[in-house]
Design a protein with these regions (language model features):
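Beta-strand-rich interaction surfaces with strong enrichment in secreted/lumenal proteins
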Residues: 96-100, 110-115
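A generic structural motif
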Residues: 1-4, 129-131, 236
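Polysaccharide-binding surfaces and accessory modules of carbohydrate-active proteins
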Residues: 2-92, 134-174, 178-179
Length: 239
């Protein structure tokens, strides 16, 4: 707050959940509007689509302080005929506490922050992935086990832990990307080759481990030819 008056800020941290499948996320099938499921706690929102039926993993969206409200239904948050430029709940400075079954799942935390003149505060939002043993998926019927989420959210509720994690991540990528550096005299070309191309090659390698001859990429993973190409892209990074 850089003014001389006390301020109250309504802060919304909001993101959309995927449906675990790139094809489902991109197609207009009625089935996609029937499967979404979420759970909610005071500081953590959970995405558990198809968890009961055939998954042992879930996603979560956490914040490191108490909230004034939350929502998991995109239609409720945006409003009738609404869009992301002016969500109806933001305009109303409120929350509906919507816990979705079907339709379009989101995670939205609503915080009210009081700032004295000259004061600043830091809020940490955490997007994560949790997994449970298949024989220990539920705490009770319909309620997922959340040990991974609770442990990770507690760890990174401390700003010092977040700073340390980002510093470690920076050192990790510096060690990988420093294996090769282009100095062309063209800043944009250097940035593309030295950072983004190498980063993309490394991520693609980590995600492409299938030895199939027929896979198409989006629907069933990566194919054998694609995986061979990935090898050439990262060999200079971790020879």
């Amino acid at each position: 707050n850089e003014t001389r008056e006390a301020k109250e800020v309504h802060l919304y941290g909001c993101m959309e959940w995927c449906l675990w499948n790139a094809v489902d996320d991109s197609t207009n099938y009625q089935r996609n509007l029937n499967i979404a499921e979420c759970e909610a706690e005071e500081r953590i929102l959970y995405h558990k689509t198809e968890y009961r039926e055939r998954r042992d993993h879930y996603a979560y969206y956490a914040v490191n302080r108490d909230t004034a409200g939350w929502d998991t239904d995109r239609n409720t948050f945006l409003g009738p005929m609404g869009d992301w430029s002016a969500p109806v709940l933001v305009e109303r400075e409120s929350s509906a506490f919507s816990c979705i079954t079907g339709w379009y799942p989101i995670g939205c935390h609503h915080l009210k922050i009081a700032l004295a003149p000259g004061e600043s505060q830091r809020v940490i939002f955490l997007l994560g992935y949790g997994k449970n043993p298949r024989d220990r998926k539920f705490l009770s019927p319909g309620v997922i086990r959340k040990d991974d989420a609770h442990t990770t959210a507690a760890k990174y509720a401390d700003p010092a832990a977040v700073d340390a994690a980002f510093a470690a991540l920076g050192r990790y990528w510096d060690s990988l990307l420093s294996s090769y550096q282009l100095r062309s005299g063209e800043e944009k070309l250097d940035r593309m080759v030295n950072i983004w191309h190498q980063y993309q090659c490394m991520v693609t390698f980590n995600l492409s481990r299938s030895a199939s001859y027929y896979e198409t990429g989006t629907g069933r993973g990566m194919g054998f030819r694609d995986s061979c190409q990935d090898l050439y892209g990262f060999m200079h990074i971790i020879p």
